[in-house]
Amino acid sequence: MFYTFNAVMTDVVSAGRPARGQSTTTRSRNTQQSAPTSQNFRACRRCRQHRIKCSEKPCEPCRANNSKCVWTEEKPTAAVLTPISPANLAANRPMMAPAAGSTITKPIASHYASPTYTDGEDGGGEPWPLQHPCSCAQHPNTPNSCPSQSGDIRQQQIPCSQHASPASNASKTFHQFLEGLGMAVTAEEGELHQFPPLPSAEEGKTSTAAAGLLPSAPTASETLNWDGQLYFVRLFWMSLAPLFPIMPESEFEALYAADGPYLLGQRTIEGALINGMTALGIQCAEATGSGARILSCSPTAASRSSIEYFRRCRDVLRDQDTSTTTCVHTIRCYILLTLYHLQANQLEKAYYLAGLGVRRAHMGRFHLTPAAHSSARVADDRIRVWWLLSWLDVYCSLQLGRPAAVQRSSNPCPPPSSPPMRFTPMHADVVSRKEASLDNYRFVLSKLTMIVVEALDDVPVFQSLEEMHGSSTAGQSMARLSETIRQLETALDELPEQLLTRHGSRTPTNNGQTHRSRPTCSTMPHTNRQVTSSASSAALTVGLPDWLQRQRLILELHYLDACLVLQRPFVLWKQICSSDASITKHAESAFSRACSVLSMLHSIYSRSDILDRLTMVLPFIWNAIITIAAYVFVGSADDDKKTQLLKAMNNALAILEPLARINPDSLKVYQISQALAAELREASGGTDVVAMPPPPSAATSTSTTFTDDLFKSTFTGSLDLDEFLNDEVTMTDDFSELYSF
């Protein structure tokens, strides 16, 4: 969330002159006394969270904080003082906490980095204004008061006795540690949360251009014919639609088969939907480096062609009148645009677009229970797109450490109905079996959304170390966080059979019941904990389609990443409150999950290519690496932990090395991982405890590779080949026949 230091201004800098007949000293004293009543903050908590206009009467958070909601359409006045550039701000940041009693200058930045939204990769592009800006004259002593939403950065002098604390010093030192690894931490990121998000694409491209590895390419303006566009639409449907099912397959087939050629180039909502799918399909082709070959043009002209179709979809949404009825296709277009930025690892833009989509869905009453007179198909479509958009908003909020637009109190929409947790009968066709699996996937994803939304509402996960240190509600927050982690682990253990990985299959017990064969992190002991979770033994199943295996892996990664993001602040708090057992428990669990995520991804990338087109897995890698960096910074790792850390970093380097050749974001993360691995080796005495895995030999025969990769590496546990090919196997083992094409 967004926090400011609510301090009385000691020496207010003013550009005006004192009144006639009044001394400067008297003027300064009067200013100090009237400062608390003259501060105005232009955003209440409700408006920041919902991104909507304040109502005529004060909203509930404002009544609780003794403040008043004010709606105004006036433009914010210009700042009296000269704005400070972010570059000068980062260069002049104090390296150590000043002495008590002195004052430091603290920047107050706006909630939105810019009053307009642009999609240009270099900062250009036509603006997309954020409509209905809100303002709130809030009481200056409220804990959640927000600074002005204007684009200016003002100065405010704050006593260091109210600012400096052991927790604050630890946070700043951790940021200096990250800067030493090559990670640029801005002042805004340092104030909002301790763990910076994934480096933006612009930063990665700058470093890449400097290194001369990936040449910059202009935006392509060519227009594909219908056959070429249809290929990328199908590529999107095969790669991303199973993970983000925006519509049934029958409706998708009817959309492009009947009206596709007519909608080509039309500024309609159906044409915008096809353009959004085309942009994501080209983006998937670019992720594998095959975009130029498919487009039959030069690599320079093809590398950025997807942005053209993104803009066409965006322009249709921007030209729509907000007074018109919001249809299902409109929310689907918002989902596609948000996915486009997520695939490009532009979390800031995805966060803003998800917020706009949630607000548009509120205007169309998608968050409410469908009307009784609505048909079953329309009601299902509305529920599905609402929960999918809600998850995208919650996911972006979780990654950036910002409030979500979806709130528990304003979300009465029921989750998607879950079919019976069993397999579809053998006589059902392939489409019916796939839709049944997608229904299970939607239900599990909506369950994850509800758990995370409740956690973000109840647990101050992203509050600063200064507020956590010495807080009276710290014990309640940690108890609520522990309950959230247990809910996430229980939900992961209760996944339906279709979405279970092979290593997580249920085995019968002596009393006839079933249980998971793997332990969870909450049930594992603290001392000498090894990476034995499910992620470290990830396995693929022979005969299953790629879309189903992606669903299994991405779901497990989402659950592990949510637990990791919720628990990783305790790694830094462990340095301050080392005697607290609950903080130590969460810190050790975060370390174990970070190693598990990297081990799981390394296992998948070394055996298959089913995740090659999904660049959205990069935030999972980044969160694990930055958690390991915090653990290294705290310096509480023994020899066994250092061995696990080096093994995890070697896994990360093995994953990022091929990705860095085609993805600028991966290159930046790869460079930071190299610096962190060097720090670990230096701390371990200069020796690499865990050697990098050797590359496969070219002399390996085809039969040996087939046997090792397809059978020996894919099955774990007690399952063998004879049992898999037996006619009397269980439904779980016979899953490949149900989904054979």
From Swiss-Prot:
Disruption phenotype: With the exception of OpS5, disables the expression of other genes associated with oosporein biosynthesis. It comes from the Eukaryota. GO terms for cellular component: nucleus. GO terms for molecular function: DNA binding; DNA-binding transcription factor activity, RNA polymerase II-specific; zinc ion binding. Residues 20-34 have a biased composition (Low complexity). The keyword NADP does not apply. Gene3D superfamilies: Zn(2)-C6 fungal-type DNA-binding domain. Residues 506-528 have a biased composition (Polar residues). Its main location: nucleus. Residues 473-500 form a coiled coil. Keywords: Coiled coil, DNA-binding, Metal-binding, Nucleus, Virulence, Zinc. Residues 16-39, 139-167, 501-528 are annotated as: Disordered. The keyword Nucleus applies. Residues 44-69 bind DNA. Signal peptide: none annotated. It is found in: Nucleus. One of its GO terms (biological process) is DNA-templated transcription. Transcription factor involved in regulation of gene cluster that mediates the biosynthesis of oosporein, a metabolite required for fungal virulence that acts by evading host immunity to facilitate fungal multiplication in insects. Binds oosporein cluster genes at a conserved 5'-CGGA-3' motif with the exception of OpS5. The presence of this motif in the OpS3 promoter would suggest the formation of a positive feedback loop for self-activation. This is Oosporein cluster regulator OpS3. It comes from Beauveria bassiana (strain ARSEF 2860).
